[in-house]
Amino acid sequence: MTRWVPTKREEKYGVAFYNYDARGADELSLQIGDTVHILETYEGWYRGYTLRKKSKKGIFPASYIHLKEAIVEGKGQHETVIPGDLPLIQEVTTTLREWSTIWRQLYVQDNREMFRSVRHMIYDLIEWRSQILSGTLPQDELKELKKKVTAKIDYGNRILDLDLVVRDEDGNILDPELTSTISLFRAHEVASKQVEERLQEEKSQKQNMDINRQAKFAATPSLALFVNLKNVVCKIGEDAEVLMSLYDPMESKFISENYLVRWSSSGLPKDIDRLHNLRAVFTDLGSKDLKREKISFVCQIVRVGRMELRDSNTRKLTSGLRRPFGVAVMDVTDIINGKVDDEDKQHFIPFQAVAGENDFLQTVINKVIAAKEVNHKGQGLWVTLKLLPGDIHQIRKEFPHLVDRTTAVARKTGFPEIIMPGDVRNDIYVTLVQGDFDKGSKTTAKNVEVTVSVYDEDGKRLEHVIFPGAGDEAISEYKSVIYYQVKQPRWFETLKVAIPIEDVNRSHLRFTFRHRSSQDSKDKSEKIFALAFVKLMRYDGTTLRDGEHDLIVYKAEAKKLEDAATYLSLPSTKGELEEKGHSATGKGMQSLGSCTISKDSFQISTLVCSTKLTQNVDLLGLLKWRSNTNLLQQNLRQLMKVDGGEVVKFLQDTLDALFNIMMENSESETFDTLVFDALVFIIGLIADRKFQHFNPVLETYIKKHFSATLAYTKLTKVLRTYVASAEKPGVNEQLYKAIKALEYIFKFIVRSRVLFNQLYENKGEADFVESLLQLFRSINDMMSSLSELTVRVKGAALKYLPTIVNDVKLVFDPKELSKMFTEFILNVPAGLLTVQKLSCLIEIVHSDLFTQHDCREILLPMMTDQLKYHLERQEELEACCQLLSNILEVLYRKDVGPTQRHVQIIMETLLRTVNRTVISMGRDSELIGNFVACMTAILRQMEDYHYAHLIKTFGKMRTDVVDFLMETFIMFKNLIGKNVYPFDWVIMNTMQNKVFLRAINQYADMLNKRFLDQANFELQLWNNYFHLAVAFLTQESLQLENFSSAKRAKILNKYGDMRRQIGFEIRDMWYNLGQHKIKFIPEMVGPILEMTLIPETELRKATLPIFFDMMQCEFHSTRSFQMFENEIITKLDHEVEGGRGDEQYKVLFDKILLEHCRKHKYLAKTGETFVKLVVRLMERLLDYRTIMHDENKDNRMSCTVNVLNFYKEIEREEMYIRYLYKLCDLHKECDNYTEAAYTLLLHAKLLKWSEDVCAAHLTQRDGFQATTQGQLKEQLYQEIIHYFDKGKMWEEAIALGKELAEQYETEMFDYEQLSELLKKQAQFYENIVKVIRPKPDYFAVGYYGQGFPSFLRGKVFIYRGKEYERREDFEARLLTQFPNAEKMKTTSPPGDDIKTSPGQYIQCFTVKPKLDLPPRFHRPVSEQIVSFYRVNEVQRFEYSRPIRKGEKNPDNEFANMWIERTIYTTAYKLPGILRWFEVKSVFMVEISPLENAIETMQLTNDKISSMVQQHLDDPGLPINPLSMLLNGIVDPAVMGGFANYEKAFFTDRYLQEHPEAHGQIEKLKDLIAWQIPFLAEGIRIHGDKVTEALRPFHERMEACFKQLKEKVEKQYGVRTMPSGLDDRRGSRPRSMVRSFTMPSSSRPLSVASVSSFSSDSTPSRPGSDGFALEPLLPKKMHSRSQDKLDKDDPDKEKKDKKKEKRNSKHQEIFDKEFKPADSSLQQSEAVILSETISPLRPQRPKSQVINVIGNERRFSVSPASPSSQQTPPPVTPRAKLSFSIQPSLELNGMMGMDVADVPPPLPLKGNMADYGNLMENQDMMVSPTSPPPPPPQRQQPPPLPSKTPPPPPPKTTRKQTSVDSGIVQ
């Protein structure tokens, strides 16, 4: 038989690629993407578990799994699989899983914005993950992508409030175990800052991007402007040159080279290949350019063709002339400043044409800049622009998509701010400025064209050395723009001349001038008419000076002018001419040789950008020092005045010169100081930011080119001389510069010595060492000087001396150097230069010196002493912290030799100081995190040996140890309670916890060893220990159950559950206390309780017995455990409410403590009682907590009452009051003012009218300012009366008012308050009589099924409805609270199947309150007074339903109609502190048909009497309800009137069968007889008030009544009305003592309805226009008459629509479900709840008018106009309706509405709690949802294996067991 076999190594790990639904208990469901650990395999099936839920193992088809590589570790039980993916891929995968869960939650919460953000991030990560997995990316792109991925993960984690991930520089997650604490802290800081910056960018993308970009660009030394020319829209008509450049409008000068594009006449670039690739980058922009007030991007368009465009005969015209056409200008200041950035935006730059010949291009540019707008007529350029950071090399690397090899590079004219060493240039920028040319023999001014070319001294032209613009080829001669007939043209055209360096000294620029004619024939004959030139090298060997040059214009024959020999010997500028003694301003021509100086003038300006040629004579003199040694001293001094840019260009040559001077004068000291100063000057230059990139050049020079072997002696000597003379005023400044250059001076000294040693094998070693020692001693002596002059130098020494360490130790003993440094620091005068001193120490720690063990031995004690000194004085904390951090960082390293002793030094000197610094620091200090990291690092680096040694360091002073431990415990507790690090720094916090845990355990050992015995016991110390340990254990960051499973697994894997570790330690420490335990009771009960409540089972089991131990301790001491009991009850309440504790804790508490108690001789009984008490309390508290955040306030109230009743029962007054106020607040939120008043009354009852002082717990609220119980009681009464008033419970308010009035009158004598109170009471009495109060309905609700919480399950409650709340609304409200509950259809008690089912079943029906009148009202009293007690102060409620007994009588159905009446008694009267109370007893009675008839008759009589009384009291009442009532009774058409009773009960047969009923029959007859006088009075009143329109109706009624009266008086005798009925106050006859509902209540009294018979009758509709009595008819008749009405009513359809709007959707469904076809009354015996519980009144009473219709005397109902507010409720009288014969009038408590009532006004709606009905969008809740969209088409699932596998193997063999329990990380 085949069986399951363990999988091979390559089959251990896989991913599900299709969903699989388990089909049996053994199978495992899979979702796409689930990773599985596969343990066994069998013919196409696998067995294992998903990594999501490792606890559930099962089988699944192998075809659904894609196997992946994984590393398998361990075997059998300990087998784990680790995916073989890249770490980053694993991180992305886990991140996606974590985010997807949150993403789903965001969807559920409808957080759309965040949902979309997360979706984008998830898509990005999935995309990038695929790219990385594809393995196709080149290394640099992969590196970039990794950066993007990690940045996205970190950003996403932050916005989702997940943990911060810390990484190394390569983006890999840091392993905290291998990283020092300080590095970890710094990594967190960096990560946090980066994420914060990203968040800021995202938050206000535009604004912050501007700021960040500006900051980024400001920090970049070099910038470039990228320009992409998209199109030139200009009507030129000929070829053109488009010249683009940057321009400074303030200085009116161009600041960059031109970018030149040649444009053809066809409107396209001449080089068609570059059609969509016209890109240029303007480089070398720097910070100075950012500071320019304005920068413009200028485009000049030069037409190349004819002189005049309008000339049409092109063949005869000269072509190829450069003519000005126009300009386009755009302000790019914001782009260059980084304020605007949009590389995709195309900018349109409007074109301005040249207006006339005198309109020079430069002038037009300035005009356009000054103008507000340009009339461009649609002409202009389209460009995109973007600012890029970096020089050209960086840009090409970082923006290859923008800048490639084809992109033109236009440099800045001049050097960039930072000259890069490899940037070799030899560019001369020549600008043609202007000229002034005489017209000569011509009648008009000439059309002058200047041609520029470069010639050597032999007259040979240099080819291709002129560059008109970037993006264009080099040319040999440049022709200027021609201005037509302009005498003084101004060109401002710049070109670049680039000549090989060797040709410069032989070359000159030549400018020739020629008149150009527009006619081709004339033009050819025009020769050069003049010439100007300028040499590029001056006579002294320097290059042409920058700036303007006024050139001499020579005239001669054209041929002569072409010969260089003719003019080269002549002066080229007017300045030279003057030097030679000639006048440069002569008006006439002067002849020089064969050339004549013309009076024409011509100016150019030049700018030399050369790294090889200098314009500086002094520098040249130094470089060529051998040619004239006499000037050497002067040259050396002058060097220091030369511009830095010139020096760095010739750095190597200059240094060579200096050291050559030094070496060639080795015997004398003449030049030593000067050379030293020059060297210092050069080193100082390179330190400047502008030349910082020359540092590598200097380093390279020292390493490779420097060769002065004896320089060290001279340099050391000069430096020592300077230091020794530090206090001399003249020397001080030079010494300061020298010390700033110390690093490189020592590099030269050391390199020189090393070279010397290589040549002479360590010769003169001792002398060299001695000279260095003397130098260091001089420096140290200088440090101790107190002179003011030396302060700046000493500061510089502290800053720069550490820079020499790494070089000096190559040629000098490091230990000696360490001693020197120690002395150096110790010599700094106290209180001076503290920051500089600490910075110096920081640099020393960074140096190689500190990594050497021997050197550290010397340096560390000095450093720790310095730190201690400054920390104790709270000086320069930031520097101290940085220094300590760096020291600890070095000591953590494994490559720095032994560190144990050094950690000890730090511990001894600094641990306590650092602790105290942390304690004294505010949480808001920026440094608190750094110091805590330092303290954690010290503790982490301490070994057990260190802890043991720590105590010894305190010596014999016991108090020192106590103080130290006290400080530490308090500090730890504070840090744990209020962590200094953000919550998302999980790794840092966990590392800190791990370190603290070890330290706490180490300190606990000290407690046990030194402070436990009787003599040395320290109570406070132990107390602090326990509080700290519990605080540690209960801190948020250790509660693993709150984390995701992945995070929990990671923490457990790396650190274990630290709560367990410390919990067991606390337990052991407690038991160690022995006889001292009693000192900790009750103080330690709370902390121990906190610990036991942690949801960790093993910890609970281990620590719960401590409670029994505490009980035992207290019992042995006091023979009771009262203190313990009080404390645990108080604390338990706070803890459970705060979220701790669960069902399991309750069970464990019960089990463990009972076990212990039962074993104890004395505690068995009392202990058990206590345990049961706590368990009961816990049940209630857990219920309360579960429901506390529930939207359902009713449940919250129930639980609150359960808890407060429990506290009352166990006499915990303080807790009882606390929960009273919670209940009161809930009531106020719901506007339940009556209940709020009753709740507060419970508090008031606890107080006496006395001067006793209030206990603290009695004044629970800030609102009550009372010192005595009497004061507090008075304040409470005032508030309660206020609430009763708001709840319209004036009777209750009056009762309290009387009690309070007595106090005011007889005790307090506060007549002012008494008067106010009595006024209120008077108002209350008036309200009782005059204000109509809506009467609430009462509903019985049963909760059945195990799905309900314990406080509801299996119980029945009576609910008091809200004002105007119908049963449907109440039911809907109930079902929204329990959406999963099923509504029961019957009112009969449910069976056990329902009670024990796991679901939820709700039974709800209306009950009638049973009146319980106070004794004082058992006499005739006004109905307005009595009506209050019908629905208030009630404790018993009844529900009636009809049942049949005996045979059915088709002629008279009343004879065997019995009523089953159920009486419910609640725990308390309603209303009370809740709007519902539990039913405590249920009693059922059956009422015979005869008794039912008596009740019905009695009610009818009461009804008539009441209405008559009301009309007597208030003659203004409307007559319609009275009409309906009387007509319904007297009209003989009603089914024979009370003839049904006569048929049923007044027969001989009935008397024979029921002889005992004789008295009841007589009573019924008496009631029938009594009806006549009431009716007579009613008809009399009706006759008085009837209108003429209704007179016929009244007369018919009178006729009917006459017949009725005759019959009744004949059969049953005559009754006369008591005389009291006329009394306006309305005293009532005895028969009316059973009072009836006020009509205003809109609610009936009896509790069953005839409709209960039939299962088909429809419940009354919420908006029904019919009168409320209507449903009391048997259904069949009702329906028919209704149908008839419907036919007669043409507006019915409209009305129905209105009704629909008012109806709740819920009711519509209800109606549909229970509305089958009409059927007979007898159809069904089953009682359907929907029938028995219909609330027979409209949602809001709606007034209607009655119209008489023809002779039929039938009444229809028409809707009232909105103004008819005072008309009575709707009424539909029918001929068939009668009160007297309905046997079931009191069934279901739904007696017809008292028609005479005017309904009370609806209350103002304060909040949603006012109405119980659903909100308006209820339609959405039940409307049928649209069908879901079809699922996306996917491929078919993989085929399942044909064989069904056997069940998984039983765990028999060891092998199988081991396979089973594999674990996956």
Swiss-Prot record:
Q: Where in the cell is it found?
A: Cytoplasm; Membrane
Locations of Basic and acidic residues compositional bias?
Answer: 1680-1694, 1705-1716
- Extract the ranges annotated as region (Interaction with NCK2 (minor)): 1837-1852
User: DOCKER domain: from which residue to which, for each copy?
Assistant: 1207-1617
Q: GO CC terms on record?
A: cytoplasm; membrane
Could you list this entry's UniProt keywords, alphabetically sorted: Apoptosis, Cytoplasm, Guanine-nucleotide releasing factor, Membrane, Phagocytosis, Phosphoprotein, SH3 domain, SH3-binding
| GO BP | apoptotic process; cell migration; hematopoietic progenitor cell differentiation; phagocytosis; positive regulation of epithelial cell migration; positive regulation of substrate adhesion-dependent cell spreading; small GTPase-mediated signal transduction
Phosphoserine-modified residues are where?
A: S1681, S1743, S1756, S1761, S1764, S1858
- Residues covered by region (Interaction with NCK2 third SH3 domain (major)): 1820-1836
**Residue ranges annotated for the SH3 domain, each copy included:** 9-70
Main localization category: cytoplasm
Which GO-annotated molecular functions does the record name? guanyl-nucleotide exchange factor activity; SH3 domain binding
Q: Where is the composition biased (Pro residues)?
A: 1825-1851
Location of the region described as Disordered in the Swiss-Prot/TrEMBL record: 1613-1723, 1753-1778, 1801-1865
Q: Where is the composition biased (Low complexity)?
A: 1639-1664, 1756-1766
Pfam families (UniProt xref) = DHR-2_Lobe_A, DHR-2_Lobe_B, DHR-2_Lobe_C, DOCK-C2, DOCK_N, SH3_1, TPR_DOCK
Ranges for the region named Interaction with NCK2 second and third SH3 domain (minor) are: 1793-1819
The cross-references to InterPro entries, in alphabetical order and at most eight, read: ARM-type_fold, C2_DOCK-type_domain, C2_domain_sf, DOCK, DOCK1_5_SH3, DOCK1_C2, DOCK_C_lobe_A, DOCK_C_lobe_C
Q: What is known of its domains?
A: The DOCKER domain is necessary and sufficient for the GEF activity.
By sequence similarity, the record places it as follows: Belongs to the DOCK family.
**Name of this chain's protein:** Dedicator of cytokinesis protein 1
Protein species of origin: Mus musculus (Mouse)
